[in-house]
Amino acid sequence: MSSPWYTWTCCGINLFGRGNHAYKRLGDPLEGCPERWRQEIDLGLPPGVCLGDVVQSNLGTTALHQTYLLAVQSNKITDYLKRFDVAKIPAGCQETVKTQVKKLQSIQNVVWNTMLALAVGEITVDDSALQSLLNKRAGECVSLMEMEKLATAMASDDSVIWASEISHSLSEPTSVLPLTPAVTRQPEATLPKPPTEDPSVSAMHSSIPPRPSSTLEETTESAIGST
């Protein structure tokens, strides 16, 4: 089909090129999706999956809302998993932490599979069925509750590096009492001890017999008569 006459000049070439049809933008299936939904779905998807993969089929508002709710739970589980670094956990608690981490990862895998199945249109989840799945949401999951208890126990352990600062701040006194002035006491006067008698002297005194009284009287009378 020949081009319109205005696309050619007298020299046979249009300096501005041939006229093109106006570009018509394709419709965005997520035009009615709130920005919060977009962000949660982007964060809640499994590694290697983007939002475009989820909405490759024109999802309805109901499916998008269900995908958003599942993404919120996936993000909560991811946040809990980031809190636990096995290198900073005491050796006695590492096995328990590993068990709980495996439980959380299995729950997250179920959430991811449900999101992808909704995206490709393989399944249609009823609201009541989705609610039964969301009843084990991240905030009330048994595994997460056990993890919270374990985190509290580890925080009270002074041997943990990242808990030492918390325990130090809790051990500091909140108020300082005024110091009372010290009372000085005068030393009490002590009497000198009596000198101890030599045991040989005391034995000598005890060996001298007492003088009889009759001899003393005779001596007195003889002295008077001589005078």
From Swiss-Prot:
Stretch list, region Disordered: 183-227
Listed GO CC annotations: host cell Golgi apparatus; viral tegument
Leader peptide range in chain numbering: none
Superkingdom per UniProt: Viruses
Feature: compositional bias, Polar residues: 213-227
Family: Belongs to the herpesviridae UL51 family.
Post-translational modification: Phosphorylated.
Protein task: Plays several roles during the time course of infection, including egress of virus particles from the perinuclear space and secondary envelopment of cytoplasmic capsids that bud into specific trans-Golgi network (TGN)-derived membranes.
Coiled coil: none
Subunit structure: Oligomerizes. Interacts with ORF42; this interaction mediates ORF42 incorporation to virions. Interacts with vBCL2.
Pfam families: Herpes_U44 (PF04533)
The protein, known as: Tegument protein ORF55
Lipidation (S-palmitoyl cysteine): C11
InterPro entries (UniProt xref): Herpes_U44 (IPR007619)
Keywords noted in UniProt: Host cytoplasm, Host Golgi apparatus, Lipoprotein, Palmitate, Phosphoprotein, Virion, Virion tegument
Localization per record: Virion tegument; Host cytoplasm; Host Golgi apparatus
